[in-house]
Regions:
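N-terminal cap/lid segment of alpha/beta-hydrolase-fold proteins
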Residues: 57-110
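Conserved alpha/beta-hydrolase
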Residues: 139-161
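Primarily recognizes the serine-hydrolase "nucleophile elbow" in alpha/beta-hydrolase
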Residues: 177-179, 184-232
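Short, surface-exposed "cap/lid" segments of acyl-processing enzymes
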Residues: 97-145
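Short beta-strand/loop motif that positions the catalytic acidic residue
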Residues: 232, 237-240, 244
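Short alpha-helix in the alpha/beta-hydrolase fold that links the catalytic acid
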Residues: 248-258
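Alpha/beta-hydrolase active-site loop
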Residues: 159-180
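C-terminal catalytic histidine-bearing segment of alpha/beta-hydrolase fold enzymes
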Residues: 265-298
Length: 298
């Protein structure tokens, strides 16, 4: 049917009031760029499995010493935009049923287009995931990507990495999902925090509310294929340093290969010569979030 100019004008007006594309699960360009020239310009030195596995050129002298004003403590000003902290950041204690959880929230408390939750590792708390200047400014980028695209980012303080910690995050997932009106929730976990991610994969009620997951420098779950998350075929992206002395990259690579061969939606980014903290510094959040929101087959 031929559309008149009036029809097109009406459609354009309707589109202007629709939610962001991330809410409808569209396209790899769902999130608008934020400092991509500084964070996304990474050199792929090896790739296989149709590009699902990529090895990235990582160099400590360039990616830490060349990027930080004070090594590992304060990134150079060009890498951050701190206005988001004053406009949209709030420390709060959420009452979640019979639980209470300390979080830093960036973005709206309700009606968000999507939610990202980051779980820190041992010795961390909500301050780690909301610090603008450490880890090369990568959390500041995550905060801005969420806020600038109508989303909400939560950095909770996880008191333990056992069933109690899993229950706390399950409650946060449920809360975020309800507050947004059923929009996508993405769970991301670093280091020992990955115990929480793997625990959540076994919770069928949480899995119903999740869009996908990212594991940074995490442990491997040999029973992942028995989980509700696996059965739902939700996407998972791994990032790891090749010289991680805490959790061996080879273990996660083995799990990735098993998933990939089963045609499971998965990606793996390996940072050549990278250490345990490298993925928290170097993970390209825009690439990871866009793919989880709309995973492309290999």
């Amino acid at each position: 049917m031929r559309m008149s100019t009036a029809h097109l004008s009406i459609l354009a007006a309707i589109a202007a009031f629709l939610p962001l594309t991330v809410a409808s699960g569209a396209a790899a360009e769902a999130l608008k760029p934020f400092k991509d020239e500084l964070f996304s310009d990474q050199t792929v030195i090896e790739s296989h499995d149709n590009g699902a596995f990529q090895t990235i050129d990582y160099q400590e002298m360039r990616d830490i010493n060349g990027r930080d004003q004070i090594s590992e403590k304060r990134v150079k000003p060009a890498y951050v935009e701190t206005g988001v902290r004053w406009k949209a950041q709030q420390d709060e204690t959420l009452p979640l049923g019979d639980r209470k959880l300390d979080v830093t929230r960036i973005g709206p408390a309700s009606g968000q287009a999507f939610t990202v939750i980051f779980i820190h590792g041992r010795g961390g708390d909500r301050r780690l995931g909301s610090n603008d200047y450490t880890f090369g400014g990568n959390f500041n980028r995550l905060k801005n990507l969420a806020y600038n695209n109508g989303g909400t980012y939560y950095a909770p303080s996880v008191k333990s990495f056992d069933s109690n910690g899993v229950a706390d995050i399950a409650a946060l997932i449920r809360y975020s999902y309800q507050q947004s009106g059923g929009k996508p929730v993405i769970l991301t976990c670093a280091s020992m925090g990955s115990f929480v991610c793997w625990g959540i994969t076994r919770d069928a009620e949480s899995v119903k509310r999740l869009k996908g997951m990212a594991i940074l420098s995490g442990v491997t779950d040999p029973d992942f294929t028995k989980s509700a998350f696996y059965k739902a075929k939700l996407p998972v992206w791994f990032t790891h340093g090749s010289k991680d002395p805490v959790y061996a990259a080879a273990d996660q690579e083995s799990l990735f290969e098993k998933l990939y061969k089963a045609r499971y939606p998965t990606r793996f980014t390996l940072f050549a010569t990278g250490n345990h903290g490298t993925p928290v510094r170097m993970t390209d959040w825009r690439e990871v979030l866009n793919w989880i929101l709309d995973p492309q087959p290999s």
